[in-house]
């Protein structure tokens, strides 16, 4: 009997149906000599620092660097029940072998291996490696199971990625948090260089100084020809005025036939980019929608970095294209002879081929698919048609005209064969897209022009323009930048380039938003003030996109067995150790960047009595000047940090639960002045200063009876 372990219940159900394991048990399915169960994502994770040493529990410079000699793992508390089921099944005497059926990729391999190892399983391991959840693909996959050892290098690469992220995250975050005090400054192996790219772009935008320039226009015979950029408006007006009612001589005409090749098929990153550009979907949303379609058997495996199909998929591609035209996706009747050969290239298919629809699109009721998923399915279908379509061909005309010794230029474009763009245009007309229309090039037909002909100038004008700053990143352009990071410094034979992988980039972006370092403004991704300051203080070794891209490339080499895992981890450990040695102290001015005072604690404001910093202490807010000013309590109630901040700014605060003779009550406290106080405790007189408040009472809500 074989135990099959999938990544999630829905996938396990699909596999069990094909295998004939139809009897439902507690946490698994059984039948036909198979047990089919599942993980729930990661069941096992790396242990926290305090699990290794008690000293590592405290955030202090002295405890750094934190580098475990032997890595420890622990079962996640919220998935412990399913882990126990899997452990019991692995040790079931009926089980002869275990089949890893988690997602066929680096992370899926890690999810299974950590569970398998944690359970102490030693039974033979096999690997199911498929790119589609169609029944035929699952059946073929089980007929061609591979030994688990074939994927040992992939597992080592996944483990290196996890341990490297832990080392850089734990040490980097703790180091810069304890140095700068105040709030936690989260550092990540991939998220920090991604943030650095956003900050670099934002700095260029903020420092950009726009400059006006002018262009003189001459118009006649349907033409609008323009001069070069002119910095002086008066000069532009003089040039335009000199050509009024004049004659323009055509001095140059260049006509060229140009073409745009069909696009490649989608890998995950290009799909995420288009979904963001056309529909405003975040990278994470697109991955979730595509994963759902994959589990519904409607598209192939989503976490791929390939844009081709393998050479043996020619028949599959033809059948899917026919299915697209026979489904409800595209109702337009067109004569189409797809060029399948151009999307086939086994040499450029890594673990998985490009994302395409499956034959299930003609078997299932597509009207039942949620709208967001339907948009992704339609995108994938449309891209398959575009990728196998004909070239988009157009005629380009560029002409120069001379009038009164000034050269004017005009250009035109005339499409004579729309080719693959026919499908793209039809797709865009079928959906309301959020595409920036300024990025699309319009067709502009020119009248017939010949060198030596003259054109009467019917009208002139001067237009004003301004130089433009770089554009803010959108998720579309950020994903592209992450994918290309470090490319200019890498040779052409390097396979993996960029920050993260197609499977991880969405989570990296979401983490930056969640941690408060990046905010979304419509489609734009903009670093927050904290994000800008964080990148300002971090060294290149943790924020350089190129260095991180180098690491990602090395992880790929680990997965191929070309670099030892120990070599990769040794480099990470050395970097972390050097980081701690190099950065051991910062100035008070630098600490103040993140709201920390000399003590390294978060500053809430200035003391109203002595002007010293009021900081957040272990037992509440207090004045570092030790002037006796009580700022952490008001009328016997301990104040929150936000209430203290408001008081120090002279604002009124709402305090609930104040004690009175008739019970507790709520009131607004408005600071008016400072007064002395004194009381005796345990025979000792305690004196100091406190706010004198004016009170306002909230209006009670009146209940309207019938």
Regions found by a protein language model. Name each.
Residues 9-16, 33-36, 40, 76-87, ...:
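Amphipathic alpha-helical transducer elements in NTP-driven molecular machines
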Residues 11-16, 180-212, 217, 224, ...:
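NTP-handling and nucleic-acid-processing catalytic cores
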Residues 233-266, 272:
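Metal- or metallocofactor-binding catalytic centers and their adjacent structured scaffolds
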Residues 93, 137-220, 255-259:
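C-terminal or mid-to-C-terminal helical accessory/interaction module adjacent to the motor/catalytic core
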Residues 1, 101-104, 181-184, 255-264, ...:
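Conserved short loop/turn motifs at secondary-structure junctions
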Residues 2-3, 25, 79, 90, ...:
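Basic, low-complexity terminal or inter-domain segments flanking catalytic cores
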Residues 1-162, 166, 432, 469:
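Intrinsically disordered, low-complexity regulatory segments
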């Amino acid at each position: 009997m074989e135990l099959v372990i999938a990544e999630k219940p829905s996938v396990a159900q699909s596999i069990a149906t094909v295998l004939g394991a139809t009897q439902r048990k507690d946490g698994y399915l059984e039948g036909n000599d198979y047990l089919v169960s599942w993980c729930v994502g990661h069941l096992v994770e790396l242990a926290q620092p305090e699990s290794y040493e008690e000293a590592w529990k405290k955030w202090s410079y002295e405890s750094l660097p934190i580098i475990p000699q032997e890595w420890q793992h622990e079962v996640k508390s919220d998935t412990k029940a399913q882990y126990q089921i899997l452990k019991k099944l692995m040790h079931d005497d009926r089980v002869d072998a275990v089949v890893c059926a988690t997602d066929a990729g680096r992370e899926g391999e890690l999810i299974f291996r950590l569970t398998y190892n944690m359970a102490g399983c030693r039974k033979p391991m096999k690997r199911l490696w498929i790119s589609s959840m169609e029944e035929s693909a699952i059946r073929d996959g089980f007929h061609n199971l591979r030994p688990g050892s074939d994927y040992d290098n992939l597992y080592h690469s996944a483990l290196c990625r996890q341990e490297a992220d832990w080392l850089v995250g734990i040490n980097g975050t703790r180091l810069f948090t304890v140095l700068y005090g105040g709030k936690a400054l989260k550092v990540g192996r991939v998220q920090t260089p991604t943030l650095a790219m956003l900050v670099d772009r934002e700095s260029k935008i903020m420092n950009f100084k726009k400059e006006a320039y002018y262009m003189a226009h001459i118009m006649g015979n349907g033409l609008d020809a323009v001069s070069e950029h002119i910095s002086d408006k008066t000069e532009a007006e003089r040039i335009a005025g000199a050509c009024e009612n004049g004659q323009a001589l055509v001095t140059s005409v260049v006509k060229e036939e140009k073409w745009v090749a069909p696009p490649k098929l989608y890998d995950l990153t290009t799909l995420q980019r288009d979904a963001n550009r056309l529909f405003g979907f975040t990278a994470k949303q697109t991955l979730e929608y595509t994963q759902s379609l994959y589990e519904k058997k409607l598209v192939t495996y989503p976490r791929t970095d390939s844009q081709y199909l393998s050479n043996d998929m020619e028949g599959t591609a033809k059948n899917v294209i026919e299915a697209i035209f026979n489904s409800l996706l595209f109702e337009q009747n067109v004569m189409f002879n797809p060029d399948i050969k151009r999307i086939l290239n086994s040499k450029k298919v890594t673990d998985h081929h490009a994302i395409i629809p499956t034959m299930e699109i003609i078997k299932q009721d597509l009207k039942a698919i949620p709208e967001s998923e339907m948009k992704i399915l339609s995108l994938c279908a449309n891209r398959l048609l575009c990728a196998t379509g004909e070239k988009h061909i157009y005629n380009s005309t560029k002409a120069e005209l001379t009038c009164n010794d000034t050269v004017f230029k005009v250009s035109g474009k005339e499409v004579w064969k729309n080719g693959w763009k026919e499908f793209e245009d039809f797709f865009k007309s079928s959906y309301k897209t959020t595409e920036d229309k300024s990025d699309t090039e319009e067709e502009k037909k020119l009248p017939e022009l010949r060198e030596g002909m003259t054109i009467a100038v019917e009208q002139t004008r001067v237009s004003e323009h301004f130089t433009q700053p770089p554009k803010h990143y959108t998720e579309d352009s950020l994903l592209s930048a992450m994918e290309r990071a470090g490319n200019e410094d890498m040779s052409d034979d390097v396979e993996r380039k960029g920050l993260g992988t197609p499977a991880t980039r969405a989570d990296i972006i979401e983490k930056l938003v969640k941690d408060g370092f990046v905010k979304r403004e419509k489609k734009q991704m903009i670093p927050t003030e904290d994000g800008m300051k964080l990148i300002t203080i971090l060294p290149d070794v943790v924020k350089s996109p190129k260095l991180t891209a180098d690491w990602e490339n090395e992880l790929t080499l680990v997965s191929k067995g070309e670099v030892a895992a120990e070599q990769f981890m040794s480099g990470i450990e050395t970097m972390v150790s050097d980081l701690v040695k190099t950065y051991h102290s910062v100035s008070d001015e630098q600490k103040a960047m993140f709201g920390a005072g000399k003590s390294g604690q978060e500053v809430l404001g200035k003391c109203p009595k002595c002007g010293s910093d009021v900081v957040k202490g272990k037992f509440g807010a207090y004045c570092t000047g030790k002037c006796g000013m009580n700022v952490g309590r008001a009328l016997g109630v301990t104040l929150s940090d936000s209430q203290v901040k408001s008081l120090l700014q002279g604002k009124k605060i709402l305090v609930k639960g104040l004690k009175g003779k008739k019970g507790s009550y709520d009131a607004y406290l408005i600071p008016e002045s400072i007064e002395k106080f004194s009381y005796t405790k345990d025979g000792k007189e305690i004196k100091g200063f406190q706010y004198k408040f004016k009170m306002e009472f909230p209006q009670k809500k009146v209940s309207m009876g019938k």
